[in-house]
């Protein structure tokens, strides 16, 4: 039985430079994922996840509405983005890499996450047989690879939003007995 993401104790975050001056932080409020963990052979493990793109939130409603538009995430035509691992490893202590395919707006690109294993809690108090395991995964993607567009502002001669976007997934997985 696979491990499932606990959405109440997990986060999908992103960080992007705005006018090269400040960093805008955002998150997706609704997502799910599974981890098929092979404890004897971790390289044989796999992970996949789905994010509801319409749940994007930067804390500023007009910006969030803009991010949902056709030339950005186009949430009407592409309500989800997905990630599916293709390979896991190499391992160095509690750190490893997850190689996989990220699909945004129907465009699939290979993406590698650098992952830190934060540990396991077993058994979970008051829940006999339940286990929790936490990971923090980081990557950087180029928004142009997924046709997420911004237009240059002629008056300042630059693009307001950087091409590179840092993604951080802080995940707690639960395994039921």
Question: Where are the language model's segments positioned?
Answer:
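Low-complexity, acidic/polar, glycine-enriched regions of mature
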Residues: 1-177
């Amino acid at each position: 039985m696979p491990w499932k993401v606990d959405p109440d104790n997990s986060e999908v975050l992103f960080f992007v430079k705005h006018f090269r001056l400040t960093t805008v932080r955002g998150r997706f409020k609704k997502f799910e994922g599974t981890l098929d963990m092979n404890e004897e052979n971790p390289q044989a493990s796999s992970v996949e996840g789905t994010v509801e793109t319409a749940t994007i939130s930067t804390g500023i409603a007009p910006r969030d509405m803009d991010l949902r538009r056709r030339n950005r995430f186009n949430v009407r035509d592409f309500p989800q983005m997905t990630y599916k691992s293709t390979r896991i490893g190499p391992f160095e202590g509690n750190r490893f890499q997850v190689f996989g395919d990220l699909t945004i707006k129907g465009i699939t690109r290979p993406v590698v996450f650098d992952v830190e294993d934060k540990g396991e809690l077993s058994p979970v108090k008051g829940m006999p047989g339940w286990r929790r395991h936490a990971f923090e995964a980081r990557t950087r993607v180029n928004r142009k690879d997924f046709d997420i567009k911004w237009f240059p502002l002629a008056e300042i001669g630059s693009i307001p939003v950087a091409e590179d976007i840092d993604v951080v997934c802080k995940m707690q997985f639960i395994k039921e007995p």
